[in-house]
A protein has these predicted regions:
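Residues on the lipid-exposed face of transmembrane beta-strands in outer-membrane beta-barrel proteins
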Residues: 44-46, 66-72, 109-113, 129, ...
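Outer-membrane pore/translocation modules
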Residues: 81-180, 264-266
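Predominantly the C-terminal beta-signal and adjacent terminal strand-loop region
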Residues: 195, 227-284
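Residue-level detector of the transmembrane beta-barrel scaffold of outer-membrane proteins
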Residues: 39-43, 79-83, 122-126, 158-162, ...
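Outer-membrane beta-barrel pore domains and translocons
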Residues: 43-51, 85-89, 112-114, 128-134, ...
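Outer-membrane beta-barrel strand-turn architecture
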Residues: 72-76, 113-119, 153-158, 185-189, ...
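Detector for outer-membrane/organellar transmembrane beta-barrel domains
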Residues: 141-221, 225-228, 232-235
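Short glycine/proline- and aromatic-enriched beta-strand/turn motifs that initiate or cap beta-hairpins
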Residues: 21-94, 281-283
């Protein structure tokens, strides 16, 4: 059994135990009367290509992901939240870089706070760290990635603007920023359509990490620019179960970056690509 399968089994057992141990509404009168509240979500999905959180297109072949998202709310004191994700490439086309059964784990922990401006508008802030151990690599690069992330969004029923920054701390250093807007549309009680568009900008160190060369010119000291537009249809087919389908269009915006991708011989060196995702999730 692979490591990610053990992880999924452990997560499911832990979630079941916590759900059973959690007091019910009848036992507490109201859940909101307790100081803290726990919630989580388990999901499994298949993607036609893999786009990393750094804004980099890492693979253009099918990928499987298993995710655990969790949050502990402390009333007016904010929340602790995070995630754990196992990623597996469903092929061995990059075996010269990774072991044939390629499995990668990424996890993060954050603190977030909602500042309620009106009944409908909330200003969210979140910050924390990401841990990405690169175990099992064949090329001798078994180091661990440490990243810092910071989030802000203006949550509202109309059009939510958001931005976040991701900074690689170790090994090496680079920074990327993402700015975007999103909106959810309730089609029925069970169906929700989500739409978003965002752009990613990276400094010259991020540019060099992707393309292996210095940028020819520097806009705000960098030239790594990409964009993603997406649609997701979510179906709540049971009280705690969701199924979803997602389509995204990824584009490289920087002209020199597009030329650098074109010169590459790697099969995953694509300047633009449509990415499709199918998934199922359980909330607890």
């Amino acid at each position: 059994m692979m490591r990610h399968e053990y992880f999924v089994i452990l997560v499911v057992m832990t979630a079941a135990w916590m759900q059973a141990a959690m007091p019910t509404d009848a036992e507490t009168n109201l859940v909101t009367t307790s100081f803290w509240r726990f919630e989580g979500r388990l999901s499994a999905e298949f993607e036609s290509a893999y786009l990393s959180s750094s804004g980099t297109l890492c693979d253009t072949r099918p990928t499987a992901l298993q995710n655990l998202d969790w949050a502990v709310h402390f009333g007016d004191y904010g929340k602790l939240y995070g995630y754990g994700c196992f990623l597996s490439m469903m092929h061995d086309k990059q075996h010269e870089l990774h072991r044939p059964a390629f499995n990668e784990f990424e996890g993060g922990a954050f603190y977030g706070y909602d500042w309620r401006l009106t009944d409908d508008v909330t200003f969210f802030n979140g910050a924390g760290g990401v841990w990405n151990p690169l175990f099992g690599y064949r090329n001798g690069y078994d180091d661990t990635l440490w990243e810092f992330r910071y989030f802000q969004s203006l949550e509202n029923p109309y059009l939510t603007p958001y931005w976040d920054t991701l900074t690689l701390i170790e090994p090496g250093q680079w920074t990327r920023l993402r700015f975007g807007v999103r909106r959810d549309f309730a089609l029925t009680d069970a169906l929700t359509l989500s739409a978003w568009v965002d752009g990613v900008w990276g400094d010259k160190r991020r540019y060099k990490a992707r393309y292996g060369e210095e940028p020819e010119y520097q806009f705000l000291y960098g030239a790594f620019c990409t964009s993603t537009a997406g649609l997701q249809l979510t179906w709540r087919f049971a009280e705690r179960w969701l199924a979803y389908a997602k389509a995204r269009q990824f584009d490289t915006l920087d002209r020199r970056g597009r030329r650098a991708e074109k010169r590459k011989t790697d099969y995953w060196a694509r300047r633009d690509i449509a990415i499709f995702t199918l998934g199922v999730a359980y909330e607890f």
